[in-house]
Amino acid sequence: MAYTEMVSVAGLSYKSAKTWVLVEPEPEEPQICVQLFGTKPEQFAFAVNAVQERVGDKLTLIDINMACPARKVITKGEGSALMKEPELAASLVEACVREARVPVTVKIRRGFAAGENTAAEFAARMEQAGAAVVAVHGRTASQLYTGEADWSTIDEVAARVGVPVIGSGDVFSAEDAARMLTETAADAVFIARGTYGNPWVFGDARALALDGVPVPERSALERIEALREHLTLLHETQPFMARGRAFSSWYLKGLPHAAAWRGRVVQCTTYEEFMALLDEAEAELAVGPDADGR
């Protein structure tokens, strides 16, 4: 299932057009989860009703993000800062549950400050408030994404609550996802940074975890073609250049002469230049000794 980007309940309440764009499902998406953040129960209640009306039957879950460690979020008391305010966090869950026609879920971290481990207690309070699922990331907010995620946090939360638990943190591949399901009490797995340059990871993880299907290796040409499609979609929907360069670097990693190609990506200033560069890369790969890119 696809999650939206983090959507500000304040933005929805103020009827910001830029915010509303974030909740619109693509025509080919059968279902989505809308991920909300904020601090005011009344704004969450408004947002849930408004999203339900806007998204309709495609809405499967409402998620409250209590895990984001970004400074611009936590300085407003939002995201992972809510882990310091469990009663306020519970009131947000309750406000959503009262209005929602779909399950309400929460995403949390191991704790807020370095060395804290409050996830299990916090998760139990969110379940009491009505959360139907708890997702937990094995780092504290102060760690951001440094160090290693402590997967034992998943087991601690699962032992404390009776609702499904989703594991998160350091899932960079299909193999990581399968290992988390095997080694922890997680009922499901979030894949976030593991998607960078690897849009196949979701299907690969499902096939590996459920059916034991080995992860296939993608050729350089397959990766170039996927990058082309990704850049085209990005060009059609969002500000392009900064993200286009980042996405290109992820896909090109590990390809023949990757450093040289990444250097040329930085010089691209338009979508058309990106496409021309990919044409050149495909032509070189097709005739070179590493044509299959393996």
What are these regions (language model features)?
Residues 1-57:
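Glycine-rich, positively charged N-terminal anion/phosphate-binding segment
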Residues 2-5, 32-36, 62-64, 104-108, ...:
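Hydrophobic faces of well-ordered beta-strands that scaffold small-molecule active sites
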Residues 7-9, 37-39, 67-69, 109-113, ...:
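Active-site beta-loop-alpha junctions enriched in small/polar residues
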Residues 13, 46, 73, 176-177, ...:
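Short glycine-/acidic-enriched loop or helix-start segments at secondary-structure transitions
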Residues 36, 80-81, 146, 215, ...:
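Pocket-edge positions in alpha/beta enzyme catalytic cores
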Residues 45-78, 85-163:
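Alpha/beta enzyme core
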Residues 99, 115-133, 152, 156-167, ...:
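Alpha/beta catalytic cores of nucleotide-metabolism and tRNA/nucleoside-modifying enzymes
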